[in-house]
Swiss-Prot record:
Name the UniProt record assigns to this protein: Phosphopantetheine adenylyltransferase
Site features described as Transition state stabilizer, chain residue numbers: H16
GO biological process per UniProt: coenzyme A biosynthetic process
Catalytic activity: (R)-4'-phosphopantetheine + ATP + H(+) = 3'-dephospho-CoA + diphosphate
Amino acid sequence: MRALYPGSFDPLTNGHMDLIERAAVLFGDVIVAVLGNPSKKPAFSVEERIRQIRSSTAHLQGVEVVSFDGLTVNCAKEHSADLILRGLRAMSDFEYELQLAHTNRSLDDTLETVFMATSTQHSFLSSSVVKEVARFGGAIDHMVPKEVALDLNRLFNSAFLPH
C-alpha cells in the first residue's frame, strides 16, 4: 500500500519522524507530501523542508518526499496513494482531522484516511512549539532531527547547539 502523509512540516519534528517510520513498516511506501501554502509565512522554504525530510528519512526504505499545492486528494491521485495518513496527538486534533477526512472523502470516495496516534513521548510536540522554543534559545535536540535543529538554530541565531 502507498500512504500519503501530507503536511507543512515547518519544521519536521520527531513526532512526524515517528509516524513516518511506523507507517513505512505498516504500509511499505510512504509519500511525505510537503504543502507549499502561499498564504502562510513558513520559517523554511518548501525546498529546505524537502531537504530536511529527505536527509532525516534517508535510512528508511520506501519513503518518498514530494511537494504539492492545492487539494490533498489531487496529490494522492497524482502519486497513486491508496490512503491519506494523519497523526493524532490528542482528542483536540481529532475534530479537525475528522472534518478534513470527511471533506477528502466527499471529493474522492475511493480514498480512505487512516489516523495513527502519536507515540506518548512525542504527543506534546508541534512545529509551532518547536519554533517558539528555538526562537528563545531553548534545547530542541530532543524534539527534532539533528539537521532540523541545526537549521533552526542558524535561523534564530540561537546560542544552543545540539550535541
